Amino acid sequence: LYNIKIITDSGCDIPVKAKLKNVEILGFYITTEDGKSYEERYDITNKKYYKILESCTNIPKTAHITMMRYGEKIEALVRDGATDIIIVTINKGASATYDAAVMAKTIFFDENPDSKVNIEVLDSNAYSVAYGWPVMQADKMIEEGHTPQQIISYLKSEFARTQILLSAYTLKFMKKSGRISAAAAFAGELMGLKPIIVMDHGDTTVVQKVRGDKMVIPALIRQFKERTNDPKHYIIGYTDEEYGKELYSACEKELGVPPMLAIELGSAVATNAGNHSIGIMYYTGE
């Protein structure tokens, strides 16, 4: 009989109220400019984090999940009888989290050469609910009695076909985090341009620029419809509740179905996109 557990990081943006039976979420540590440190999900709410972003001069720093924290979690799960552990990480191109997980696995087997546990480390190649949603479904699959291999295959196929469209109503954070150049941000702010960005397999690309706040949501929805062959299955995310509500009702009206989920975007996206940003996660055709 299998006893399968999943470890992921708080970049997954799985809602705090989601009741998952087989998933452990390790929070990123966030350090603000006043030197305070918080573990995401556990010490600080997203809303409080957005308030910090609103007033900060220097962007908070986020630390990856360390090898030691993974090692401790693996040991605890094995002690509790886990036969299979699947570790899902945020896109490894943007964080040392994946490498830390791989290292923790190696060290665990060096120290426990006779252990029969299976440990699989998966780079989601993604951000936010683009890996959080598949992890939520994998939790259900564990409850339904699927094998570890079925769950790993499912996760890999989901990660291969999720994308996120994102836009920000203020360019301050994209400029500070280097997502867009200072020159582009300056020109954009001068002309009232807002970037529409696609996050795909770890790559972030500006696919369109629109003029004025009113054009952001229609452009996001238009890009979404062009990029998916499954417009009924999507999730929206936001760092600003008012814009989130606007996006929700515009999507429902335009697509005929509400999103599967509406979530607050956590620190991994919010730090780079800012506290006035919105996004849509969806599936591509592959």
Give residue ranges: language-model regions.
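Mixed-charge interfacial surface used for oligomerization/domain docking
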Residues: 2-5, 11-19, 23-33, 94-97, ...
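Short acidic, glycine/Ser/Thr-rich loop/turn "cap" segments at secondary-structure junctions
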Residues: 86-89, 119-123
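Glycine-rich phosphate- or other oxyanion-binding loops that anchor nucleotides, phosphorylated ligands
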Residues: 55-106, 148, 152
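Short alpha-helical interface patches
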Residues: 46-54, 72-74, 157, 214, ...
